[in-house]
């Protein structure tokens, strides 16, 4: 992992930035710029990074600039908050038959085959082989329409996409073929993209993706420096292209980390919700952390409750050189508490030295005496998105004395709920079997990015193959949930994942340029003198693109499906069995994906009878989860408005004697579940019925 230090810049920042400006920075961002720290960042004062910036009007956007410029922006009265996130982690032959998707591709029992034709499938990832046969059509032409390499500074004949101003964009087949691959360190992106949209033209379609005729757009991240704001930009880039060519679009995010509130209110999740809508869907991976011990949740009923105490442990050897070593604590709005760090003797079973880290103003450096070498940097913030307290602990510990541990203690001073997440790369949480200490549970191991957004479709993984190259996976059972598949609920109690799909072991394309030595070969094919490889991978990273490919076939049938309607179709058509039972739940969501049933349900919704489209009279509609707003564009008399379910049941009706152009009428939707609805509006002989999703 590349490391660039910014100690030269930190002195400037601390001396020039006022206290009020520091309060605009997220806790992680404060620590990145703290005076005198050896901040482990992939950026220096002149190198650029991508941040989330929230303005005083509440609008959040992304900005690509240097840390020095961000420091200047913090002094700007129009800026409400600046946040730089941590880096993301990367998270079919049997699978297509098992889910009924082979029948979708063949058109069996359907009006026609559904292969994703006319739909854009976007992948934000790393490890792409642009020239793989899996991304070619029947006549050998690439189906990849665009590539944005965010971390590449220059490439002959290519420039940065105009709307974003960094990286390079490849817009022609010649340039994409010349580009070959974004990196030589992994095959993750190739495998993921081919599961979603790999071609059926080779090897008799045995390893084709779920949407083999879809148009493909790839965004290649630089995993050494990318932030979640870069992922947001990647999603927007893909949606912008789909808008330009007039096609529906689904974007896959087989990425995640545990930097955030896990409640759908992060800057990333809020922007993802805003970008989605009719014909604009995001599918994400739940995460591969079910067995890992890194999350604790505690609801305190009163100040008299016993404190929460847990050990912060090291999954890897302690080091002061890794930016990802963190623990985050989130406390619900208005909760009062005291938080401390201490060095604990496992031999004497007592704290040797302790320091209060909350309440604090801004940042604090904690040293644990002679028991640990290095420091823990702490920053606090009342997060403006959810009004929760966010406490960020950045470990810079290089050694710990034998038989000692680091303890985090939360003493309640009021009732309230606390969630604690370790980064699960370098740090974990544990009780060490010491009486009075709390061990993590397996609940709420769902990851940020793909697992927590309110409109994102989140996929867990189940097992469709346990053998590979004469070997057998010892911890997996056919049909069972993957032992790794992260579970919900989210911190605000929502069911995640919504659906599960095949994710273990999946055969798909792998990159010919991958020199990491980690590929598990399954098959190969020679075309035009070049050998193309296919290999095994497992994880929710494989389940998510399977779902994304299924969604692409649904969008082919109904291009204006909203995220809410997609979720409704997937959940109501999902399968249950002896493994996936007592649904919905936080492991399986609503069950196993049934691609054929989902496509059939989609076709039913597009074939609702008595829907007329021959009238020019129709107000503009604005739909949100709680309200349907009608804005009338012309004067009309004797107007009737009727809201019906997709099955035709009348749910609400309104009669208006006269309406004037520019007037509006609202219909409450909060009491109705998510799904597809019909709205019929009539005025005299003018009648029109439209479908919309809530």
Regions found by a protein language model. Name each.
Residues 1-28, 587, 667:
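Bacterial Sec-dependent N-terminal signal peptides
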Residues 21, 674-694:
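C-terminal tail/sorting-segment detector
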Residues 21-603:
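Loop-rich non-cytosolic ectodomains and luminal regions
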Residues 323-325, 626-630:
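Structural beta-strand segments of beta-rich domains
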Residues 402-406, 637, 661-663, 673-676:
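A glycine-anchored, Pro-Gly-centered beta-turn/N-cap motif
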Residues 600-627:
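Residue-level detector of functionally pivotal "anchor" positions at catalytic/ligand-binding pockets or at interdomain
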Residues 643-651, 677:
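Short, glycine-anchored, charge-dense loop/turn motifs used at functional sites
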Residues 650-671, 685-686:
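Glycine-centered tight-turn motifs at strand-turn-strand junctions
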């Amino acid at each position: 992992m590349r490391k660039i230090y910014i100690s030269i810049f930190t002195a400037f920042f601390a001396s020039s930035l006022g206290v009020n400006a520091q309060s605009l920075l997220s806790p992680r961002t404060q620590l990145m710029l703290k005076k005198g720290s050896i901040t482990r960042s992939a950026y220096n004062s002149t190198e650029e990074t991508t941040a989330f910036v929230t303005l005083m009007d509440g609008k959040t956007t992304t900005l690509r600039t240097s840390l020095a410029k961000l420091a200047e922006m913090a002094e700007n009265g129009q800026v409400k908050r600046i946040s730089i996130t941590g880096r993301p982690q990367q998270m079919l032959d049997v699978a297509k038959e098992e889910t009924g998707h082979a029948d979708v591709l063949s058109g069996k029992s359907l009006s026609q085959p559904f292969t994703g034709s006319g739909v854009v499938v976007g992948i934000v990832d790393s490890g792409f082989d642009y020239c793989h046969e899996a991304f070619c059509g029947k006549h050998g032409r690439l189906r990849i329409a665009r590539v944005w390499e965010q971390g590449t500074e220059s490439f002959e004949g290519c420039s940065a996409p105009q709307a974003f101003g960094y990286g390079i964009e490849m817009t022609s087949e010649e340039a994409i073929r010349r580009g070959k691959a974004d990196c030589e360190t992994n095959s993750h992106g190739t495998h993921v993209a081919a599961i979603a949209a790999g071609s059926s033209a080779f090897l008799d379609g045995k390893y084709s993706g779920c949407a083999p005729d879809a148009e493909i757009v790839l965004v290649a991240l630089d995993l050494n420096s990318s932030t979640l704001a870069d992922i947001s930009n990647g999603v927007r880039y893909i949606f912008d292209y789909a808008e330009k060519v007039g096609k529906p679009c689904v974007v896959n995010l087989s990425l995640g980390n545990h930097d955030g509130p896990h409640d759908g209110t992060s800057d990333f999740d809020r922007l993802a919700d805003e970008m989605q809508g009719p014909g604009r869907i995001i599918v994400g991976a739940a995460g591969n952390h079910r067995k890992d011990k890194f999350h604790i949740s505690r609801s305190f009923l009163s100040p008299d409750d016993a404190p929460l105490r847990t050990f912060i442990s090291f999954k890897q050897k302690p080091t002061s050189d890794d930016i990802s070593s963190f623990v985050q604590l989130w406390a619900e709005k208005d909760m009062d508490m005291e938080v401390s760090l201490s060095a604990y003797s496992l031999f004497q079973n007592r704290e040797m030295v302790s320091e209060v880290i909350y309440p604090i103003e801004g940042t604090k450096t904690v040293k644990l005496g002679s028991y640990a070498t290095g420091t823990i940097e702490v920053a606090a913030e009342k997060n403006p998105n959810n009004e929760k307290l966010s406490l960020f602990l950045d470990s810079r510990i290089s050694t710990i004395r034998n038989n000692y541990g680091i303890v985090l203690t939360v003493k309640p001073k009021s009732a309230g709920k606390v969630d604690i997440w370790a980064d699960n790369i370098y740090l974990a949480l544990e009780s060490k079997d010491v009486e009075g200490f709390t061990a993590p549970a397996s609940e709420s191991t769902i990851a940020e990015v793909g697992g927590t957004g309110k409109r994102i479709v989140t996929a867990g993984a189940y097992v469709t193959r346990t053998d590979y190259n004469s070997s057998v996976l010892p911890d997996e059972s056919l049909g069972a949930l993957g032992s790794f598949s992260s579970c919900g609920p989210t911190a605000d109690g929502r069911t995640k994942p919504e659906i599960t799909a095949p994710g273990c072991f999946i055969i798909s394309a792998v990159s010919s340029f991958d020199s990491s030595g980690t590929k598990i070969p399954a098959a190969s094919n020679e075309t035009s003198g070049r050998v193309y490889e296919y290999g095994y991978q497992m994880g929710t990273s494989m389940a998510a693109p399977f779902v994304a490919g299924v969604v692409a076939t649904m969008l082919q049938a109904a291009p204006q499906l909203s995220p809410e309607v997609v979720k409704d179709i997937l959940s109501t058509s999902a399968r249950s069995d002896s493994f996936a039972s007592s649904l919905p739940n936080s492991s399986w969501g609503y069950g196993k994906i049934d691609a054929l049933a989902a496509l059939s349900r989609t076709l039913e919704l597009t074939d609702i009878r008595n829907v007329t489209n021959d009238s020019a009279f129709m107000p503009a509609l604005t739909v949100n989860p709680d309200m349907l707003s009608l804005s009338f564009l012309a004067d009309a008399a004797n107007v009737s408005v009727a809201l019906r379910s997709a099955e035709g049941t009348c749910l609400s009706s309104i009669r208006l004697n006269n309406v004037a152009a520019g007037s509006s009428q609202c219909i409450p939707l909060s009491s109705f579940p998510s799904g597809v609805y019909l709205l019929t509006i009539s005025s005299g002989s003018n009648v029109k019925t439209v479908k919309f999703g809530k």
